[in-house]
Amino acid sequence: GLEVAVSCHYRIAVKSAKVGLPEVKLGLLPGAGGTQRLPRLVGVAKALDMIVSGNPIGAVEAHDLGVIDELVEGDLTAAGIAFAEKLLAEGKGPRRTGERTDKLDGVDNAAAVAAKRAEIEKKMPGLFSPQRCVSAVEAAFALPLAEGLKRERELFGECLVSPQRAALVHAFFSERQASKINDLPKDTPVRDFKSA
């Protein structure tokens, strides 16, 4: 997903695309360097919002933030080749996300982390993975990339063995299974209920 895309030197997307890091909704945190590279593209505060909420954003917003470099229409493969040819013609070379610091420098990242931790305590008390997500993003500006990636893996491992993760994954698949009851007629009305 997006974790792999942000490790690329450049990214393109169709305008209708949505991008995000939904792992927190399953009790995990984004792996594959997502917590280390996204802050380098959008800044710590926006990365925290995206990672802790798990909600996707549209391609236009992602482009405005710097996650996507080029919005295209039509055939994505042909557009990708054309974009690569344009980069070559303009003499643009590699642009390693992990080496970028312009969105990290000169900003009070610690204040953004403290604010997000306080927000989580108020809105999501007791949830395990959101706080681990914040710790992983904190490593993006507090540690060199290699050490930040190591810290991300450690925190991912903590989330992986969490009972909350197991429960959230179970709930995720249970919701999908419940909507696929074989002998339930398709025209059965949905009923709202307030408690069970």
Residue ranges and their predicted role:
Residues 24, 29-37, 129-137, 159-160:
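Long, contiguous hydrophobic alpha-helical segments, chiefly transmembrane helices and signal peptides
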Residues 3-7, 51-155, 173-174, 178-192:
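Amphipathic alpha-helical segments at domain termini/boundaries
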Residues 1-51, 65, 80, 84:
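CoA-thioester-processing core
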